[in-house]
């Protein structure tokens, strides 16, 4: 086969996205070191890489590709947290029996797939997580960013380097309007069931010099067992963090806490290939901010307000890439350089089936400023 070519995404009209690339012809079942090197370089350079026509990709090959970015990684990025019934992640994922690092996600009834029989998948609807959902009568045409996040346990396990997401079955073609509903008046036209991406590198670039310095010198402390801790809380309408209504579970109601597993991570992470800084904060899981002068901000409302102020500019419509899924698309995204969100709500009979793989990294994130 000829050498694979990487083509940067052409931004749609009115978009200012400066990330994303497409690779059309690559045999992932027989991936040469040279072709993998091209894909790896593309991931770090473009942050989101779409590999077209991967209908035949096996779960094993998907796992092996994901692991090739980090050979020391072997276990699913959230470990066994899915076993916790109270975790907000619990309902959304099912595991492939013969390749347990690969999850099945989607919407609707699937009679048989890769050893899973008679499963009903549920695409998360924003009304299950947002405090003030869109009225029912507007629900068919309008939607929200469900939850902007990084794929990471944020407790014990290191954030995965890459997530791979394969579209096996995609319902056809209608579009929806994402409403921000935050007073900005912003909306975004998106394909049904898109996955939305925002660049952490652009997020950092958009900061004032003062905010850049604050971000570079500060670290975020995440809650222990964050997806259980946050489970009663409800999201802002932008999907970028939570309302501070004192609904989080008290630490005494969480599973046993290992203090050494609590993560305090830099706000700004360094791209290992390009050296660029990316503002990478999981806004729903933040609990404290450790400032450069040694002080700790532990007022949760204030912590969330600071994170929101830093992150909100980069999720305005012109900076968001909303991928228009086609069956056979395998999207790789640099989980340490972008935030992403589920989007959309499916109607009766709209069936979607995706496979996802991410692996807890062998090494921790690299701070931009040591």
Curated annotation (Swiss-Prot):
<dbReference type="GO" id="GO:0005829">
    <property type="term" value="C:cytosol"/>
</dbReference>
<feature type="binding site">
    <location>
        <position position="340"/>
    </location>
    <ligand>
        <name>Fe cation</name>
    </ligand>
</feature>
<feature type="binding site">
    <location>
        <position position="151"/>
    </location>
    <ligand>
        <name>Fe cation</name>
    </ligand>
</feature>
<dbReference type="Pfam" id="PF02668">
    <property type="entry name" value="TauD"/>
</dbReference>
<dbReference type="GO" id="GO:0097641">
    <property type="term" value="F:alpha-ketoglutarate-dependent xanthine dioxygenase activity"/>
</dbReference>
<keyword id="KW-0408">Iron</keyword>
<keyword id="KW-0560">Oxidoreductase</keyword>
<keyword id="KW-0597">Phosphoprotein</keyword>
<dbReference type="GO" id="GO:0034418">
    <property type="term" value="P:urate biosynthetic process"/>
</dbReference>
<protein>
    <recommendedName>
        <fullName>Alpha-ketoglutarate-dependent xanthine dioxygenase xanA</fullName>
        <ecNumber>1.14.11.48</ecNumber>
    </recommendedName>
</protein>
<feature type="binding site">
    <location>
        <position position="195"/>
    </location>
    <ligand>
        <name>2-oxoglutarate</name>
    </ligand>
</feature>
<dbReference type="InterPro" id="IPR051178">
    <property type="entry name" value="TfdA_dioxygenase"/>
</dbReference>
<feature type="binding site">
    <location>
        <position position="325"/>
    </location>
    <ligand>
        <name>2-oxoglutarate</name>
    </ligand>
</feature>
<dbReference type="GO" id="GO:0009115">
    <property type="term" value="P:xanthine catabolic process"/>
</dbReference>
<feature type="binding site">
    <location>
        <position position="149"/>
    </location>
    <ligand>
        <name>Fe cation</name>
    </ligand>
</feature>
<keyword id="KW-0325">Glycoprotein</keyword>
<dbReference type="GO" id="GO:0046872">
    <property type="term" value="F:metal ion binding"/>
</dbReference>
<dbReference type="InterPro" id="IPR003819">
    <property type="entry name" value="TauD/TfdA-like"/>
</dbReference>
<dbReference type="InterPro" id="IPR042098">
    <property type="entry name" value="TauD-like_sf"/>
</dbReference>
<keyword id="KW-0223">Dioxygenase</keyword>
<keyword id="KW-0963">Cytoplasm</keyword>
<feature type="binding site">
    <location>
        <position position="107"/>
    </location>
    <ligand>
        <name>substrate</name>
    </ligand>
</feature>
<comment type="function">
    <text>Alpha-ketoglutarate-dependent xanthine dioxygenase is a non-heme mononuclear Fe(2+) enzyme that decarboxylates alpha-ketoglutarate to succinate and CO(2) while hydroxylating xanthine to generate uric acid. Allows xanthine utilization as a nitrogen source. Whereas xanA is highly specific for xanthine, alpha-ketoadipic acid can replace alpha-ketoglutarate as a cosubstrate. Exhibits ferroxidase activity in the absence of substrates.</text>
</comment>
<comment type="similarity">
    <text>Belongs to the TfdA dioxygenase family.</text>
</comment>
<feature type="binding site">
    <location>
        <position position="352"/>
    </location>
    <ligand>
        <name>2-oxoglutarate</name>
    </ligand>
</feature>
<keyword id="KW-0479">Metal-binding</keyword>
<dbReference type="GO" id="GO:0051213">
    <property type="term" value="F:dioxygenase activity"/>
</dbReference>
């Amino acid at each position: 086969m000829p050498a694979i070519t990487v083509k940067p995404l052409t931004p749609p009209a009115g978009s200012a996205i400066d990330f994303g690339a497409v690779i059309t012809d690559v045999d992932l079942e027989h991936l040469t070191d040279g072709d993998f090197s091209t894909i790896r370089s593309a991931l770090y350079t473009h942050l989101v890489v779409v590999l077209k026509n991967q209908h035949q990709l096996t779960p094993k090959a998907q796992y092996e590709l994901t692991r090739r970015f980090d050979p020391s990684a072997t276990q699913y990025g959230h470990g066994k947290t899915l076993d916790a019934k109270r975790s907000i992640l619990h309902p959304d994922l099912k595991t492939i029996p013969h390749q347990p690092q690969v999850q099945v996600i989607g919407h609707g009834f699937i009679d048989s797939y890769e050893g899973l029989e008679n499963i009903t998948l549920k695409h998360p609807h924003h009304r299950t997580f947002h405090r003030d959902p869109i009225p029912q009568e507007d629900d068919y045409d309008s939607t929200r960013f469900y939850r902007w996040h990084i794929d990471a346990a944020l407790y014990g396990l290191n954030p995965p380097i890459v997530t791979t997401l394969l579209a096996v079955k995609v319902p056809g073609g209608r579009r929806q309007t994402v409403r921000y509903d935050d007073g900005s008046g912003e909306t975004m036209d998106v394909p049904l069931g898109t996955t939305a991406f925002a660049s952490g590198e652009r997020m950092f670039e958009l900061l004032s010099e003062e905010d850049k310095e604050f971000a570079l010198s500060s670290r975020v402390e995440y809650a222990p067992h964050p997806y259980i801790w946050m489970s009663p809380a409800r999201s802002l309408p932008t999907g970028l963090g939570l309302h501070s209504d004192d609904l989080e579970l008290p630490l005494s109601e969480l599973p046993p806490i290992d203090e050494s597993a609590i993560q305090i991570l830099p706000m700004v992470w360094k791209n290992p290939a390009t050296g660029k800084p990316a503002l990478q904060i999981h806004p729903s899981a933040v609990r404290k901010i450790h400032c450069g002068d040694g002080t700790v901000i532990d007022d949760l409302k204030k912590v969330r307000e600071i994170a929101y102020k830093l992150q909100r500019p980069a999720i305005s419509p012109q900076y968001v890439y909303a991928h228009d899924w086609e069956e056979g698309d395998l999207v790789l995204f640099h989980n340490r350089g972008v935030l992403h969100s589920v989007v959309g709500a499916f109607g009766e009979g709209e069936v979607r089936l995706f496979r996802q793989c991410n692996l807890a990294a062998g090494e921790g994130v690299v701070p931009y400023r040591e």
